[in-house]
C-alpha cells in the first residue's frame, strides 16, 4: 500500500534517535482519561467537554489485508480520530469475513485473504490486548500503511511502544492467547444486527454507516455537546459543496 503524507508526518514527529522521555509527539497532545475496554477491542475515549453528553461511538469491523478496510482506517477513521478525539469513542474488531470452527477444543480460522491474514488479524488483536489503547491504535495504523506488515511490526513498535518487543506480540498471535482473542472478535462480529455483509463494516451509534466517506461530518453532526472548531469548518465546507 502506498504510504500517505500524513503518516510520514507522524513518523517525522517521532524520530527514534530522540529519548522517549523527551520525544515530542502527537501522543503528548492526546487527552487523558481513556475508558477501559473489553478484551480484543480498542476503545479510544477522551473526556467529553460535558460529562452528561454522550460521545459518538464508532465501531470498525475489518480484516487486516482487506484493501478497502485499510483505506478506510488510514484515510477516514485515523484523520477523524486525530481531529475530534474528544467527542469520539472508537472500537476496532479485527476479524471481518473470516470463519471459525472448533477442532478438538481449539478454534481454527479461515480468512478471506488466506492464512497470512489470519495471522495478522491475531497480531492486531494482540496489540489491542497488550498495549495502551491510544498506542495500539497508532501502531495498527502504522502497520496497515505498510506493504509488509510482518516485517514492519518491529519498526512500528519501536516508534510507538519501544518497550514492547515484536517477539512478544508474535508469541501472543501464534499461541493460545491469539486464538482466544480472535474467537472473541468472531463472536462480536457474529453478534452484529443486522449481520455484516462486507468489510469494512462501520457502525456509528449502533447504526450501520452505509456512506463511510464522510465520517468526520457525521460525527460532528451527531455529537450533541459543544463541538470542536473543526466541526464548524466541516459544516461550512458542506454548505459550499451543497450550494455549488
UniProtKB/Swiss-Prot annotation:
Note the SS bond partners: 66-69
MF term (GO), any: oxidoreductase activity, acting on a sulfur group of donors, disulfide as acceptor
Compartment(s) where it occurs, according to its Swiss-Prot or TrEMBL record: Secreted; Lysosome
Q: Where mainly found?
A: secreted
Report what the Swiss-Prot or TrEMBL entry states about this protein's PTMs. N-glycosylated. Sugar chains contain mannose-6-phosphate. Synthesized as a 35 kDa precursor which is then processed into the mature 30 kDa form via cleavage of N-terminal and C-terminal propeptides. Processing of the precursor is mediated by multiple lysosomal proteases.
* Biological-process GO terms, alphabetical: antigen processing and presentation of exogenous peptide antigen via MHC class I
Which is a Gene Ontology cellular component entry for this protein?
lysosome
What is the protein's known function?
A: Lysosomal thiol reductase that can reduce protein disulfide bonds. May facilitate the complete unfolding of proteins destined for lysosomal degradation. Plays an important role in antigen processing. Facilitates the generation of MHC class II-restricted epitodes from disulfide bond-containing antigen by the endocytic reduction of disulfide bonds. Also facilitates MHC class I-restricted recognition of exogenous antigens containing disulfide bonds by CD8+ T-cells or crosspresentation.
The text of the family note is: Belongs to the GILT family.
Protein name (record): Gamma-interferon-inducible lysosomal thiol reductase
Encoding gene, per UniProt annotation: IFI30
Amino acid at each position: 500500500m502506498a504510504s500517505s503524507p500524513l503518516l510520514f508526518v507522524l513518523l517525522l514527529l517521532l524520530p527514534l534517535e530522540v529519548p522517549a522521555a523527551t520525544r515530542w509527539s502527537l501522543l503528548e497532545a492526546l487527552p487523558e482519561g481513556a475508558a477501559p475496554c473489553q478484551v480484543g477491542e480498542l476503545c479510544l475515549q477522551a473526556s467529553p467537554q460535558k460529562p452528561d453528553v454522550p460521545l459518538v461511538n464508532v465501531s470498525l469491523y475489518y480484516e487486516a489485508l482487506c484493501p478497502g478496510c485499510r483505506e478506510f482506517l488510514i484515510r477516514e477513521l485515523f484523520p477523524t480520530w486525530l481531529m475530534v478525539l474528544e467527542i469520539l469513542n472508537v472500537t476496532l474488531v479485527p476479524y471481518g469475513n473470516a470463519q471459525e470452527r472448533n477442532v478438538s477444543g481449539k478454534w481454527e480460522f479461515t480468512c478471506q485473504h488466506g492464512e497470512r491474514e489470519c495471522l495478522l488479524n491475531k497480531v492486531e488483536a494482540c496489540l489491542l490486548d497488550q498495549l495502551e489503547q491510544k498506542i495500539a491504535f497508532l501502531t495498527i495504523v502504522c502497520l496497515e500503511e505498510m506493504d509488509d506488515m510482518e516485517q514492519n511490526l518491529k519498526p512500528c513498535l519501536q516508534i510507538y511502544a519501544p518497550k514492547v518487543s515484536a517477539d512478544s506480540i508474535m508469541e501472543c498471535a501464534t499461541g493460545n492467547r491469539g486464538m482466544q482473542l480472535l474467537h472473541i472478535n468472531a463472536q462480536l462480529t457474529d453478534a452484529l444486527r443486522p449481520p455484516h455483509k462486507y468489510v469494512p463494516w462501520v457502525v456509528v451509534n449502533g447504526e450501520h454507516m452505509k456512506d463511510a466517506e464522510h465520517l468526520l461530518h457525521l460525527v460532528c453532526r451527531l455529537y450533541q455537546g459543544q463541538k470542536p472548531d473543526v466541526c464548524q469548518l466541516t459544516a461550512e465546507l458542506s454548505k459550499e459543496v451543497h450550494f455549488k
